[in-house]
């Protein structure tokens, strides 16, 4: 008995679609690690500096100013997106582990993973882009609107915020990879 289909071997039995949930679980574990590390780096971004003033002598020559992530709505948005991504990755790791232990996974679950991963990828990409643009503005300033750069004064703060935005971008790439992987798995199961 010969078959023209590539999925049917010589014995006549259909080859099951590849189970990629081990790779899925590993990517979700990396997603959790990157989101937690970006979250910790962002939360610890605080620096206090003494800044000289140009006021006459009865006033103090230096004032103390803090730079915190709470001072920027873009960084607060990144904090919320990273927190949601952490919880999301934990929940989907449990679902992925359940799919590994079960003999056959449901196409419905794969479809839900594709949709939710795509939404989370959009949220993380927008948060990373927003925080990255504010960090770049702090690094370079904007001479057209007379916004001065602040990273020459708050160097530690800028390193923390920039690192957090970069690791958040890695989390976004991992989420896009999960969308591609889940889409491929769904395609193989429904074919």
UniProtKB/Swiss-Prot annotation:
Keyword NADP: no
InterPro entries in alphabetical order: CASP/CASPL, CASP_dom, CASPL
Extracellular compartment spans: 44-73, 140-160
Protein name: CASP-like protein 1D1
A Pfam cross-reference name: CASP_dom
Keywords assigned: Cell membrane, Membrane, Transmembrane, Transmembrane helix
Entry coiled-coil feature ranges: none
Lineage: Eukaryota, Viridiplantae, Streptophyta, Embryophyta, Tracheophyta
Record note on quaternary structure: Homodimer and heterodimers.
Places the protein is found: Cell membrane
Membrane topology: Multi-pass membrane protein
């Amino acid at each position: 008995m010969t078959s023209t289909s590539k999925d049917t071997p010589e014995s006549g039995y259909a080859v099951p679609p590849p189970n990629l949930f081990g790779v899925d679980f590993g990517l979700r574990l990396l997603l959790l690690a990157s989101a937690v590390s970006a979250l910790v780096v962002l939360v610890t971004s605080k620096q206090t500096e003494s800044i000289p003033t140009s006021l006459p002598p009865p006033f103090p020559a230096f004032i103390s100013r803090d730079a915190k992530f709470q001072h920027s709505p873009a960084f607060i948005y990144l904090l919320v997106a990273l927190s949601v991504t952490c919880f999301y990755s934990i929940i989907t790791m449990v679902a992925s582990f359940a799919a590994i232990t079960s003999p056959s996974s449901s196409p419905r679950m794969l479809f839900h993973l594709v949709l939710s991963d795509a939404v989370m990828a959009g949220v993380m990409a927008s948060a990373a882009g927003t925080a990255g643009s504010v960090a770049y503005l702090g690094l370079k300033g904007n001479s057209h609107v007379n916004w001065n750069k602040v990273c020459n004064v708050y160097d530690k703060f800028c390193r923390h915020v920039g690192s957090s935005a970069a690791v958040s971008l890695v989390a976004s790439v991992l989420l896009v990879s999960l969308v591609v992987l889940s889409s491929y798995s769904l395609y193989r199961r429904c074919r």
